[in-house]
A protein has these predicted regions:
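N-terminal Sec signal peptide cleavage junction
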Residues: 1-2
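Extracytoplasmic small-molecule ligand-binding "clamshell" domains
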Residues: 6-11, 15-96
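Phosphate-binding glycine-rich loops and adjacent basic patches that engage nucleotide phosphates
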Residues: 23-33, 98, 113-118, 142-147
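Soluble periplasmic/extracytoplasmic beta-strand elements of cell-envelope proteins
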Residues: 36-38, 45-48, 76-78, 111, ...
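Short, solvent-exposed loop/turn elements at domain surfaces
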Residues: 44-49, 105, 151-152
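Short amphipathic alpha-helical segments
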Residues: 50-51, 109-110, 155-156
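Bilobed "Venus flytrap"/periplasmic-binding protein-like clamshell domains
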Residues: 56-69, 100-102, 119-176
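Acidic, polar ligand-binding/catalytic clefts
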Residues: 74-136
Length: 176
């Protein structure tokens, strides 16, 4: 017999519509009865795909379902690449939820509700045999996700490497 692990999210069925809050939404959001949410489903436990490889799950998905319930709408999370979510809010998506870092540039495009704060870290081979120093990445190959603040930070560090006459950082940007 095989065993299977299933993901169970937060039960939002008891959340009631708040008519006063729902009345604040524009018709462009409410007209189809669905809150359409863009999310990069590669960032567990916040947003990722269930075992079926199709169903978005995670605490951000639970949060978007709760928000939709308060609005009196159905919720649909659509898997997207991280760098395409913010530009698509207001056209393809009613909102984006994907552990965004709030930046001045992003605030020029969309409004944010901050409910979560996380840091960044570098991952190296066990034991750090190449003695990678995160304060000096010049000449090191670094992989980052496209469109993230980490990509911006590594690009900024790379400019400093060049300005200092050091080897460039080999930046490997990917949509993951």
């Amino acid at each position: 017999a095989s065993s299977s692990t299933s993901i169970q999210g937060f039960d939002t069925s008891s959340i009631q519509k708040d008519d006063e809050i729902a009345a604040l939404l524009p018709d462009s959001v409410t007209s189809d009865g669905t809150l359409t949410v863009g999310a990069d489903t590669s960032y567990a436990p916040a947003e990722f795909l269930a075992e079926d490889g199709k169903t978005p799950v995670g605490f951000d998905v639970d949060l978007s379902k709760a928000i939709a319930a308060v609005f009196g709408l159905k919720e649909e999370t659509i898997s997207s690449t991280f760098d395409s979510i913010i530009p698509s809010v207001g056209s393809k998506y009613d909102l984006g939820i994907s552990s965004f870092t709030v930046t001045k540039e992003r605030m020029q495009a969309v409004d944010f509700v901050t409910y979560f704060k996380a840091g960044s870290t570098y991952v190296v081979q066990k034991g750090n045999p190449n003695k990678v120093d995160s304060s000096n990445l010049c000449g090191v190959k670094v992989a980052v996700q496209t469109g993230t603040t980490q990509e911006e930070e590594v690009n900024k560090a790379n400019e400093q490497c060049k300005a200092d006459g050091k080897d460039a950082i080999d930046i490997q940007s990917s949509k993951l």
